[in-house]
Regions:
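Cell-envelope/extracellular polymer assembly enzymes that use nucleotide-activated donors
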Residues: 2-4, 28
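Short, well-formed alpha-helical segments that are part of the catalytic scaffolds
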Residues: 6-25
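Acidic helix N-cap motif at the loop->helix transition within catalytic regions
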Residues: 17, 38-47, 90-91
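A conserved acidic beta->alpha catalytic loop
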Residues: 22, 33-42
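Short beta-strand/loop segment that forms part of the nucleotide-sugar
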Residues: 26-36, 52-53, 83
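Conserved donor nucleotide-binding strand/loop of the catalytic core
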Residues: 41-74
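Catalytic-site signature of metal-activated, phosphate-bearing donor transferases
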Residues: 63-64, 70, 81, 88-248
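Short aromatic/hydrophobic "clamp" motif used to bind/position activated sugar donors
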Residues: 78
Length: 252
């Protein structure tokens, strides 16, 4: 059986070539582009990718294009890869072997090896993502960080890191930009109505303690500390926006 790799892109030229190099041995590479203005499509053409376009409109996240992308693939089995991820040869071989088994599931959670500032943030592992599926049985919701809905059974990859997607992760600058985007989307998705002063103080603090000490980022040196601090800031920014909306409603 054949497998299509599906990659959603928007101005993804920085790391796209190394991603495409890592998936060149799959049967098909489909790039679903949201009207990039850089040379993303030039790189995709160099690798012989099938290219489809999803209108950018005012979207700030990729999820609205996910369902369109997976169903544009030529093969039922699809592996969804982000433009800043790499697929190991061990993962590729495992997936091809897996779909030949008579008792396989209809989708698989795949683990991610998250890199930050050149270091593997081990505390974030396995960071499981539902990325391998029979697209004829999948529907992908448009909300941020959503997983596809599978009309069938779902399994998990072995936790051995050699089978993980390698995620390059964000630079510090991109991390800061993404915090604003993600908190705006979470604000719309969760519809939290109010926040207390206690939450403003202790929820970000607990997020830092959990990420840094409990999840093990303390073992990842300066990169782990910075990543934990970003995680706490993300929580604080979200709660601050909830409070901003709370105040706005009182005065409207």
């Amino acid at each position: 059986m054949k497998i299509s790799v599906v990659i959603n892109t928007y101005n993804a030229s920085k790391l796209l070539a190394q991603t495409l190099e890592s998936v060149k041995d799959f049967d098909e590479i489909l790039v679903c582009d949201m009207e990039s203005t850089d040379n993303t499509l030039d790189i995709a053409r160099e690798y012989g990718c099938k290219i489809v376009t999803f209108p950018k409109k005012d979207y700030t996240i990729v999820e609205p294009a996910r369902d369109f992308a997976i169903h544009a693939a030529s093969n039922p089995w699809v592996l969804v890869v982000d433009a800043d991820e790499k697929v190991t040869s061990e993962l590729r071989e495992y997936l091809y072997h897996y779909i030949e088994q008579p008792d396989h599931d209809d989708a698989l959670f795949i683990h991610r090896k998250n890199m930050f500032l050149g270091k593997w943030i081990k505390g974030s592992y396995p960071d499981s993502q539902l990325r391998f599926m029979d697209q004829t049985k999948a529907t992908w919701p448009t909300t941020i960080h959503s997983h596809p809905i599978i009309d069938g059974t779902v399994g998990h990859m072995p936790k051995d890191v050699k089978y993980a997607l390698v995620h390059a992760g964000f630079s510090v600058s991109n991390q800061i930009l993404k915090m604003d985007v993600y908190t705006e989307e979470d604000l719309a998705k969760r519809q939290q109505e109010s926040v207390s002063f206690t939450q403003l103080i202790f929820a970000p603090l607990w997020r830092f303690i959990k990420y840094y000490f409990i999840d093990g980022a303390i073992l990842d040196g300066k990169a782990g500390f910075i990543k934990a601090y970003f995680s706490a800031n993300m929580k604080f920014y979200y709660l601050a926006k909830v409070y901003e909306r709370q105040v706005s409603k009182k005065h409207s």
